[in-house]
C-alpha cells in the first residue's frame, strides 16, 4: 500500500465516476478493476491535485489514504486509480499544505506554478509575494540547494492580516511576533 490523498463530499462520499460510493474510515474497500477516469478508486499522490475535482469549501473532506492492489496511472497530474483503498485520516488545512510541500520536495525535477485554489495561495521559491482574505491561507514552498522549507499560515486578522503582501520571510516573522 502507498500513501495517497482523496477528496470526498461530506461524510466520505465519492460522487464522481460510477455513481455514489460510501467509504468508511480505516476500512478496506475493494473493487475488481482500476482504470483512470473510468473505474476503480481514484486518488492522487499530491493532495493539491485533489482540488481539480473537489473544492476546499468547508464541506468537502480531504483524506490521507492507503492505496494498493492493481494501480493505474494516466499521467494527468498525480492522479491514479487502484483496486484497494483505505481512508486513513481526514486532513486539516495545514496538514494538506504540508503534505503538498512534501510532494514538491520529493519531486524536485517537477515544475510547479504559483497558484490560488480555494482558500490556498501557494508560491514556489524565494522573492515571491502573497496576499489573501481573512480565513484564507498563505503558503511558501522553497526548495533550493541550501534547504527545503514550507511556511504556511492562516490569515487570522491578528498576526497575519488580510490584503497585506507577505514574503516568506515577513510571513514567518509576523507569525513569530509576540503579542
Residue spans for each PLM region:
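Short, glycine-biased loop/turn motifs at secondary-structure junctions and
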Residues: 1-179
